[in-house]
Amino acid sequence: EVYSSDLSEFIFAAAIEIIKKEKIDLMYLSTTDFIQHKAAPGDKMANDFYHMVDGYLSKLYDLGCEISFTADHGMKGKTNKDGSLNLIYMQDEVDKKFGKDECNVVCTITDPYVVHHGSFGSFVTIYLKDKSKINEVMDYIKKIDGVEMVINKEESVKKLKQPEDRIGDIVVTSNEKFAIGKKESDHDLTKLKEPLRTHGGLGETDIPIFISRKIDDSYKSKGILKNYDIFDLALNYG
C-alpha cells in the first residue's frame, strides 16, 4: 500500500531475507516519503516510522552490513495553525498579469500520488513565448508573497546545476512556508487529509548523511556535501 509505511517496510524486510540467503556486495534500498509528507518530526506517525526503520537497520547491521543512508530532500509544512494553506497558483498569477498562453508554468511534482502532496511543491520552472519579457516576468513574480528565489535559466544552470536543455526560461522557488501549484483548477485539495507538507525549495535542502563506520577526515576537502556524495563516501573513504 503506497499510502502507508507498509511499502517501505516491505523493502527492508525483503533486504533482510536476501542478505540471509546470498552474499551481496552492494544493495540499494529506496523508501517512499509518504510518512514525511503526512507527519512532522515528533508526531506519533513519524516516530513509529523511524522506530521501524531503526529496527531494520539494526538487523542489517547485525548481519554484517555496512550501512549508509541519506534523503533525496527535506520536507516542510505549508499549513497555518488555523488549517489554511499557504499556496501560490503560479499559472493563474502570470496569466492574470501577462495574458493566457504567454507563460507556461511546469510543476516538478506531478506524480499521481496526490494524497502525499496534492501536486504542490516549492519549485517550478516557466517557459515564455516572448523571451524578451523574461526580466519583466521575473520582476513581477518576485513581488508575489511567499516567493523566495526567481532566477533565469543561465543562473539556474550555474547555481542549481540544472540541465540547460531541460529547464525553462525562469526558475522559481517558494520560501519554506509556501508551496507552488499551477492553476487552482488543476489541484484537488480534497485528497489532502492532513496538513500539507512538501518540498523542492531551498528550505528543504538540509538532509542527513549517515555512515555506520568512521571515515577519515579527507572527505572534508569535498566541501559542502550533496546527497549523491554518499556513494563516494561509502565506497571510497576508509
Question: PLM features: residue spans?
Answer:
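Metal-dependent active-site segment of extracytoplasmic phospho-/sulfohydrolases and closely related
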Residues: 48-90, 172
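Active-site neighborhoods of enzymes that stabilize oxyanions during catalysis
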Residues: 108-238
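Acidic/histidine-rich catalytic neighborhood
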Residues: 58, 75-125
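Short, solvent-exposed loop/turn segments at secondary-structure junctions
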Residues: 33-36, 74-76, 176-179, 215-216
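Short, solvent-exposed loop/turn segments at secondary-structure boundaries
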Residues: 39-44, 80-82, 221-223
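His/Asp/Glu-rich, glycine-adjacent segments
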Residues: 1-40, 122, 136, 142-146, ...
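Structural motif
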Residues: 26-30, 68, 171, 210
